[in-house]
């Protein structure tokens, strides 16, 4: 008899959908011991929850998250609501002995994140934050290449994450669809939303960031509130750029904006080391580009006439996660990054090796975001404390 993993998901938005899809597909693709059971979906709007439950196959709905986190038929609470609610839900769930997973960023700020780490660790419950881009096979392959020592001494890390959906001045802020623009609900703008992904990937590939200096910009300073209709100041950062110094001595540049006309979800990075480089951009997610100057196994330099960037189609069974899917040469998509993350989480429970980033891991990203925002306020270099 497979063990059951009875899930209660809180939030019916974009992330509620990506996570629900992952639960539904888990046992089709990954040979884990647990069977995911979509027990309950929670949203304050009961009609919305009922519609969502019918679409995704949840057994029941709940409109009060406080009831769900205490429900005896739930093993895992999965937080897919706006950032403002992560802290209270996660702590209540952990206090009730539930496993907890959450969408990124972990919290509104470092203080909240630290309290959440303490709660899950005191309760001894499994936990993870969905930094899903780590589970793009090409990015996981980049990690493998770095860990194999093929990049050599790192010099530069370069990340950009660009979108363009807030350029129009008449886009409101707030409400179900546009809470990412409301400071009191999101905590920050592109820093916590987009750069948090870039930072998580950077920490994973290139180690701790020691210090940062940042500049943020809010291009449109007032927007109508989607619910109240009142024109209110905009408190989020529309764009953020920062310089970073990694603990390993390499230098980083990070750039993010929601005003990069034409860019819908351009999440890219490059790492340059003495022996090689890797480059990825999510508009071509099935490729990882790798430049090898010096082969680490043979110690030989690549022959000059063969030197060049390799564009690796990450679709062989030997590539990360791909043995679970189709035949070589075929691709997987955005939704599978959540499925891969869930599979890692469940395997982590089964093997007693927690999937990363857990809450403590995600606290590192939160600290870098906090330092970036502080630096943007003060104009000074800020130590991250990592
Ligand atoms: C923002 O537009 C957003 O939906 C992020 O919140 C997600 O984390 C990102 O992956 C796609 O863009």
Residue positions per predicted region:
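Glycine-rich, aromatic-lined ligand/substrate-binding cores of catalytic
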Residues: 193, 201-211, 216-224, 230-286
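Predominantly a Rossmann-like dinucleotide-binding segment in NAD(P)-dependent oxidoreductases
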Residues: 133-234, 288, 379
């Amino acid at each position: 008899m497979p063990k059951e993993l009875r899930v209660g998901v809180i939030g019916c938005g974009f992330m509620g959908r990506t996570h629900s899809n992952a639960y539904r597909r888990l046992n089709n693709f990954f040979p884990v011991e647990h069977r995911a059971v979509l027990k309950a979906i929670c949203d304050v709007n009961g009609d919305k929850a009922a519609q969502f439950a019918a679409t995704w196959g949840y057994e029941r709905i709940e409109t009060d998250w406080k009831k769900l986190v205490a429900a005896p038929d739930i093993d895992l609470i999965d937080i897919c609501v706006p950032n403002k609610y992560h802290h209270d839900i996660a702590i209540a769930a952990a206090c009730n002995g539930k496993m907890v997973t959450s969408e990124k960023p972990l919290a509104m700020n470092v203080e909240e994140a630290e309290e959440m780490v303490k709660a899950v660790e005191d309760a001894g419950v499994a936990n993870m934050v969905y930094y899903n881009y780590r589970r793009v096979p090409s990015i996981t392959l980049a990690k493998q290449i770095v860990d194999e020592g093929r990049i050599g001494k790192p010099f530069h890390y370069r990340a950009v994450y660009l979108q363009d959906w807030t350029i129009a001045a008449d886009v409101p802020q707030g409400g179900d669809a546009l809470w990412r623009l409301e400071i009191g609900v999101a905590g920050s703008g592109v820093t916590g939303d987009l750069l948090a992904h870039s930072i998580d990937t950077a920490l994973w590939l290139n180690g701790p960031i020691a210090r940062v200096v940042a500049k943020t910009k809010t291009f449109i300073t007032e927007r109508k509130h989607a619910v109240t209709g009142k024109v209110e100041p905009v408190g989020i950062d529309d764009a953020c750029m920062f310089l970073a110094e990694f603990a390993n001595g390499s230098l980083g540049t990070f750039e993010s904006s929601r005003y990069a006309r034409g860019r819908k979800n351009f999440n890219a990075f490059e790492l340059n080391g003495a022996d090689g480089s890797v480059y990825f951009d999510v508009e071509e997610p099935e490729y990882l580009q790798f430049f090898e100057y010096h082969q680490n196994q043979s110690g030989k330099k690549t022959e000059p006439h063969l030197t060049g960037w390799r564009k690796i189609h990450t679709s062989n069974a030997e590539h990360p996660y791909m043995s679970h899917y189709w035949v070589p040469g075929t691709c997987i998509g955005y939704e599978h990054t959540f499925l891969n993350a869930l599979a890692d989480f469940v395997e982590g429970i089964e093997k007693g090796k927690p999937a990363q980033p857990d809450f403590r891991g995600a606290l590192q990203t939160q600290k870098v975001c906090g330092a970036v925002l502080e630096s943007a306020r003060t104009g000074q270099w800020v130590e991250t404390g990592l």
